[in-house]
Amino acid sequence: MFDAIPVLSSAECERVRQTVHALRSSWIARGSADYPFYTVGAASYIDAVSRTPPPRYSEILVETNPVLREHFHWLYARLMNKLSVHLQAVVRTADELALPGFHVWQGLSVPTSSLSVHFDLQYMSIPWPDVPRSDRSQPLSFTLPIALPRGGGGLNTWDLSYEEQAAHFQATGKFTPVEEMAKSRTRTFHPYTQGVLTLHSGHTLHQIAAVDQAYPDDERITLQGHGLYCDGAWTIYW
């Protein structure tokens, strides 16, 4: 699955961008001192995994979910409606999980080199409600570009699935890093369009695409989220 779903007009993207900037005090610094980026909201791939410091996912979402809901309630309603129509199923959020949130890169920190190649397996780490009734075989991931740098933006994917990697390990007893497996696979670049949601399986190997050059006035703002089918509906989160 790799689908493009129009969600916002240019004017609506600008409205979201301005609101994100108005919430500057709610940005959470990520990355390094040399190449910082920010999130608005709890990000499961950072805040829910077992690293040092200990996971703070639930603690952060208690603070950030009310802020996001207050300022972007109309955006979430639009997002869930578009996804519901496309997936032909109910789409909802859950109080135990972070709302879809924002990635923010600015200026020369916009990625110009390759970022991590990965599968989206965050659902294994978060406090997922109704786990026995959740279908983990077909997770969803999505990106909605709000503002893109001068060099554009997009997603790199490879024709390699999480299931294939798991089967390889089961057959050989040897864990092969995805970076190594990807060398023999086909890479495809999927360009982003402002206001158009990119929807794909989180079990497809992927990577944020870098730009050739970053400029001081560049900005990259995207709404990020995932989905899991649970008890007859898609629950979206970040």
Locate each region found by the language model.
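Solvent-exposed loop and beta-edge segments used for protein-protein assembly and interaction
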Residues: A94, R136, Y215-D217
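Short, flexible loop/turn elements at secondary-structure junctions
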Residues: L8, H103-L108, F119-L121, L144-L148, ...
